[in-house]
């Protein structure tokens, strides 16, 4: 309400949830006007490094290791459903991604083609299947952000047929770019361009 006096554009803030403590703070967030929560299923294990939690009066982010396990995802979805909030999802299975990246490094593969093959569309579909089951179990709306593959879309269609409440979006780079036609790492994103 206070921000409406100073801004000309409608906006909303969602909270990213990585830890049990943050799950415990979801009610507080909702009370403060945050009405959606985001999870990063691509973060955990060997690929669990993230910058987060900028301390008050600081301009530096804190580096942290997180593990967004299936159990954590289920708790987040359950809490969000009880609060009547959607869950925004970065859908990639972190364990599969970690294995894919390790294999690419062992083979000395590099570049965008290695990045794409190490984070297979199957890993995206696997995460979609996991979170959608929880969405159905707890009657929670699932909002997939930046879907990056046909296989992910096909899995989403299957999950919708099973009754999952789903919204989907993508980004222009998934519609217009391919790793074969890019140089360097300017198009290195997650999920990767195909």
Labelled PLM ranges:
Residues 1-6:
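Metal-associated gating/positioning segment near the N- to mid-region
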Residues 14-18:
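A metal-dependent hydrolase metal-coordination microenvironment
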Residues 21-39, 43-194:
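Histidine/acidic residue-rich metal-binding segments in metalloenzymes
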């Amino acid at each position: 309400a206070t921000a409406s006096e100073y801004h000309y554009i409608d906006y909303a803030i969602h909270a990213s949830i990585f830890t049990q403590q943050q799950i415990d703070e979801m009610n507080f967030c909702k009370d403060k006007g945050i009405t959606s929560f985001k999870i990063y299923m691509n973060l955990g294990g060997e690929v669990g490094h993230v910058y987060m939690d900028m301390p008050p009066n600081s301009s530096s982010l804190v580096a942290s290791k997180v593990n967004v396990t299936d159990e954590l995802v289920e708790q987040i979805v359950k809490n969000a459903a009880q609060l009547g909030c959607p869950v925004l999802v970065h859908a990639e299975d972190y364990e599969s991604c970690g294995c894919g990246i390790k294999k690419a490094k062992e083979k000395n593969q590099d570049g965008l083609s290695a990045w794409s093959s190490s984070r297979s569309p199957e890993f995206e579909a696997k995460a979609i299947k996991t979170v959608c089951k929880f969405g159905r179990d707890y009657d929670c709306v699932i909002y997939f952000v930046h879907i990056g593959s046909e296989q992910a879309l096909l899995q989403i269609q299957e999950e919708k047929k099973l009754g999952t409440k789903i919204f989907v979006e993508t980004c222009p780079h998934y519609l217009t770019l391919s790793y074969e036609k890019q140089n360097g790492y300017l198009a290195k994103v997650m999920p990767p361009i195909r």
